[in-house]
Amino acid sequence: MKSDIHPKYAAVVFNDLASGTKFLTKSTVSSSKTIEWEDGNTYPVIDVEISSESHPFYTGKQRIMDSAGRVERFNARFKGFGGKK
């Protein structure tokens, strides 16, 4: 087995920019930006734009597209288009 080929796996804090929530977890990603966590230790911080805390699928605030109405409007608008002459 080759040594020193795997990335470093360490604790990091993910900061959700949309909701302001922070998660402490382990990852191979690193950052020069750090934060002091609730336990008093300092960890690298990774800013993410969206996470499970702010994504509409997980929060239950998703919008449902009215695709049936759109199809009906399209068919009504182009009903006679492309017919035989």
Swiss-Prot record:
Family listed: Belongs to the bacterial ribosomal protein bL31 family. Type B subfamily.
Source organism of the structure: Pseudarthrobacter chlorophenolicus (strain ATCC 700700 / DSM 12829 / CIP 107037 / JCM 12360 / KCTC 9906 / NCIMB 13794 / A6)
GO biological process: translation
Protein's name in the database: Large ribosomal subunit protein bL31B
Subunit structure of this chain's protein: Part of the 50S ribosomal subunit.
Keyword Ribonucleoprotein: yes
Molecular function terms, GO-annotated: structural constituent of ribosome
Signal sequence interval, chain numbering: none
Record keyword Ion transport present: no
Family annotation (InterPro entries): Ribosomal_bL28/bL31-like_sf, Ribosomal_bL31, Ribosomal_bL31_B, Ribosomal_bL31_sf
Keyword list, A-Z: Ribonucleoprotein, Ribosomal protein
A GO-annotated cellular component: ribonucleoprotein complex
